[in-house]
Amino acid sequence: MNLIEIREGKASLLIPNPKDYEKEGRYDPSWSPVFYNPKMRLNRDISVLALSVIKPKSVVDALSASGVRGIRYYTEIGGIEKLILNDKNPIATELIKKNAEKNYVNARITTKDANSLLYEIKADFVDIDPFGSPAPFILSAINATINKGYVAFTATDLSALECSSKFSARRKYDLICERLSFSKELGIRGLIAKVIREGAIIEKAAYPIFSFYFDYYYRVFFRIENGAKKVDKLLEKQGYYYECSKCGYREVDYYAERKICPRCGIEMRRYGPAWTGELWNREFLLSMKENLKNFTYFDTFMQVNKLLNILVEESKYVSPYFRLDFIASLIKRNIPKREKMLECLKEASITHFDYRGIKTNKEIDEIVNCIKIN
């Protein structure tokens, strides 16, 4: 295997030469014998930033591939006393050993099935960053997380979570769903709901503290706390979102029944079960923003800063975003400028989920009125 050296964050890494695995001038990281995706750099930068707030003593990267994520945590955060880097691919674990030595990282490196490993150990922070769906690893990852510890999941199977693929959504995430105008946000709410339900099985409450959508994936961090009563309170915030495709009316209910729009008389589209609470712990979010000044070396520093600024404003509003082009088309009006809408609504912000959307806790009628006068 021909290796090349790259640098990411403060880590120097050996990875398989992508040129050796090109097909007709194209390259996909999954074609390499050891997976390394440069497009996930922002994901890893933000994760390093999040861990600078969490300050874990023990970390598990259960699907390590090249080892980049765990190695960066160790070298850039400090204070990690126990690091486990795991991959079931023996070629990957051999490369992880080289990369760990190269960066003076003291880690336990294992070649195990991720679920098997996670049922054997406990850690302050568990990271699940799969190629595809995290669903097969959710329960074991929560089980491996100590009380008042943290776990993070990446999901790249947006076709399931956003309900482009209904059968996949049902199989992986127990979703009964159709595509709504704000499906980009519903996807992350569906993922959160699934994690909460999996934690409920073993009476562990999974509180979402930081979430974001970027490019083609979701990333969510949870704080885990033991206790059946805590779990019950979280489960009370699982519900179904409904939207009328004719007038844009929407509502939330806690039962998966079919509903007729009270205004138009047509059957509304639905999505659920989904998390109906906050996507961000504001204190955690502000701590991340404060710590960012220590990571000016990030290649994605400007992107991360911009994203955090949006999230700080967005976190003021619990309700899912409204898509302006969707509502404007229903009332046969031109799409207004977002700035005009924010000025009209007064209590609103842009959203990172969709450049066509705005976040507000106001109702559809107020959105419609603002579109009409702008």
From Swiss-Prot:
- Could you cite one Gene Ontology molecular function of this protein? tRNA binding
Keywords, A to Z, come to: Metal-binding, Methyltransferase, RNA-binding, S-adenosyl-L-methionine, Transferase, tRNA processing, tRNA-binding, Zinc
Q: Which reaction does it catalyse?
A: guanosine(26) in tRNA + 2 S-adenosyl-L-methionine = N(2)-dimethylguanosine(26) in tRNA + 2 S-adenosyl-L-homocysteine + 2 H(+)
Q: Where does S-adenosyl-L-methionine bind?
A: R44, R69, D87, D113, A114
Among its keywords, does the record have Oxidoreductase?
Answer: no
Gene Ontology annotations of biological process type: tRNA N2-guanine methylation
- From the UniProt record, report the name of the gene that encodes this protein: trm1
Query: What residues does Zn(2+) bind to?
Result: C244, C247, C261, C264
**Would I find Cell membrane among this entry's keywords?**
no
The signal peptide stretch is none
Instruction: State the superkingdom.
Output: Archaea
Q: Which family does it belong to?
A: Belongs to the class I-like SAM-binding methyltransferase superfamily. Trm1 family.
Gene3D superfamilies per the UniProt record, alphabetical: N2,N2-dimethylguanosine tRNA methyltransferase, C-terminal domain, Vaccinia Virus protein VP39
A Pfam match is TRM
Trm1 methyltransferase domain ranges (all copies): 4-371
Any idea what this protein is called? tRNA (guanine(26)-N(2))-dimethyltransferase
What job does this protein perform? Dimethylates a single guanine residue at position 26 of a number of tRNAs using S-adenosyl-L-methionine as donor of the methyl groups.
EC code(s) of this entry: 2.1.1.216
